Amino acid sequence: TPDGTERWVEMRIPIEEGRQYRLGEFEFEGVTVPTEEIVRAQFGLEEGDYYNESEVRDGIERLQLLYGASGYMEFLAFPDLSPRDQRVDEDGREVPTDGPAIVDVIMRAEEGDQYFVNRITFTGNRTTRDYVVRREFRLLEAGVFNSNALTTSVRRINQLGYFLPIQDDDITVDQVEGDEFQVNIE
């Protein structure tokens, strides 16, 4: 406040919890690279479990890591929820019904394309020879791009202690002009 005194405000927000939903059918659409069993294991959800949005988000993050390790750096996934206790009326609005509190989930995935490393370039290295830094790098030119290996490489280079700490956003991964499935790393 202008006079320097502290004042407190008490807020009361009424919350009315809705129904607690259980997971019904849990299907995957657009998944072709790993098996459905491997993809399903990333979520840790079984039919009949209580639906948990944070577990779904965590599962999507684990899927992004799984796909990123296989060169699919543009992978996207999003859940499509269909509660069984609602229907859509003629105006397109969801209307509650007396159905069970069960939600069916279709995980829609867009895998994108698999990328390969074209060229790895180190810039700003005036401390040591290029091969010293290159041997700490876990990606190889002409190999499949692996986002997990890139993160490990940054950590290993930082552990050398020769340079100021490198952050993940200091590394650029650019698509090679004219070759849609190749990337350069600098």
Describe the predicted segments one by one:
Residues 1-186:
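Periplasmic polypeptide-binding modules associated with outer-membrane biogenesis and secretion
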